[in-house]
Amino acid sequence: MDPEQTFIRVQERFSQILTPRIRGFLEYTYLFVAITLFCILVVMHANYVQQPGCSSELTGVELAEAELMQIKITSAGLWSRNDESTAADVPRVVAATDSLEVSKTDQESSTSEENTDDTFVKIDKEEPRSSFSVSAKENVRAAILRFLKKCYRRISFVLQHTARILRGVRKIWNIIGIPLNLDVPKLLHVLYMDKVNYYAVQWLESKTQEFEPTYLYTMEKGYFLLPDEAKSRHNIRTANVSISARHPCFGNRWQQLLINRVVGYDTIIMNSLQNSAGQGYLYNYQTREFYNLSYSQELPDGSAHFGDYLVTKCGVLMMSLFVFFTTTMSVSFTLRETQTRMLKFTVQLQHHAQHRLPTFQLIFVHVIESLVFVPIMIGILFFLFEFYDDQLLAFMVLVLVWLCELFTLISVRTPISMKFFPRFFLLYFLVFHIYFFSYAYGFSYLALMTTAAFMQHLILYFWNRFEVPALQRFLQSRQSHLQQHPDFHITSSTILASTLHITRLNRTTRNRTPSGPNHTTPNQNTETRSFTADGGGVGNPAQYQEQQEENEANTVPAEPNPQQAGAMSSFSSMLLWILGGASSEGLNSFLSMFRDVRDEDEAQVFADTSPPQNPHHDPLSVD
């Protein structure tokens, strides 16, 4: 079974299942999702990484009086439309005997008080929404406000005219004798819509209250590792801080809902604590993750010279390139080797099943050969685990790279896809890793989701715009050839053999220096005649391959170009040794993202060919 033939069948089946409308809908849907996630990432990064919005809520807590600080996000009343600050918005927090209670107001930064009944109540009052007044966003905010006002004026104009038309229709119906006095609140009450709204809000609040994250912050890691008995014995106190999810530091209503249900509070709390305290350790009780906040996010402004900044950014770029090349090369090598063995195993298993031969030995040998790649994949995973310091993020990056490499192996056949798809993949991959390494406490998962959405749109774009039309033209051309020659079957092996022969002939011609306008070497004439004869009257692909091997044996190899050999000798030999004997053609295709090594006259697998005028004498043309 030929791998190319299998890939063509897979693409043909997918192109039949996914109609052009479905493909276009998926393409634009992923583009919309990617742009939306990118806008959310920009807003979140500007408000909570560059300028942490909730840092002012934690600066008043003096850790000199308490060694530990427990932070709780209360989400009561988040889905209700009441903007009033009530006592229900901030639930009571009961602390231990040796703990302190922090009470936050607009005028006071923090106060500590100890009651006689060993219970403490904390009240959190919301601050005005002036905490988001940032001079850098004034222009953007003004433009957005002007756009919203213009839209509001147009919508109000349409609504006014619609209301006038409805009032006129109502008067006409009243004159006729059919009253249309509709009481909307009464109608909603009759239809039980008010109860539906009430139950919906109550259900959302009950689901939201389940997600109330609690954090424990300390300046020294040893305080966190002590058991409760040791904490009480050594008089280690805990300050309880409660912040409402409706607090203005979390933005407007839509930002609050988005943070509570999608983004999460981890990154916001980490950046706020780092901006206020500068260092320490943070523990999340829900996810049981322990964060080290001692790593500086950027150099201080006083010591951040241009040289240090340049060295830092160059290090980030080199690290991103290292991760890119290591991950893609290992995944590509593993994928190509495993798919070759899987196809070979499938053919052998079909042969054994048809002839009723024992299959235990075949399956056992295939399993043993496949176990060789298990340590490779485990090594890749452990390398990414240590590199990202986050197992889930590393696994998601590996899955994303695996998906793109699988698309490259199966579908990328046209010249424009071969030229531009690896470059866009490199661009998206580098942008994500530059953001990840530049901001240690950034929104990494949101950035990865944005990158994944853009890469999925990239895959659908190239497959829908270039690969599927080329596949359809290839299938039509093959069907027309089968109709003209019923006894002649075009397989992907024949196409690949002729493609490699044409490519080798073109490279031999370019490496030779002609002595005249009509100068041809005997070897070239021999190759041309053999290919013409095979293309004109080929009846068996095996016979064609035998003739091709004989011609190659009689052909004098072309003189190598010393410049190209010197440019690729050392580096390519090292890469070939690392990859275990990979072919130079695969290396050239891998390096094609930086330089275009394919000319327009070289052949491709998918061809846009028309039926030849004289099929008995003209060679089989493969573009």
Swiss-Prot record:
Membrane disposition: Multi-pass membrane protein
Record field: transmembrane: 24-44, 315-335, 363-383, 392-412, 424-444
Pfam families: Membralin
Protein name: Membralin-like protein At1g60995
GO cellular component: endoplasmic reticulum; membrane
One Gene Ontology biological process: regulation of sterol biosynthetic process
Segments of this protein annotated with the region Disordered: 99-119, 506-567, 602-623
Main location: membrane
Polar residues bias spans: 514-531
UniProt organism field: Arabidopsis thaliana
Keywords from the UniProt entry: Membrane, Transmembrane, Transmembrane helix
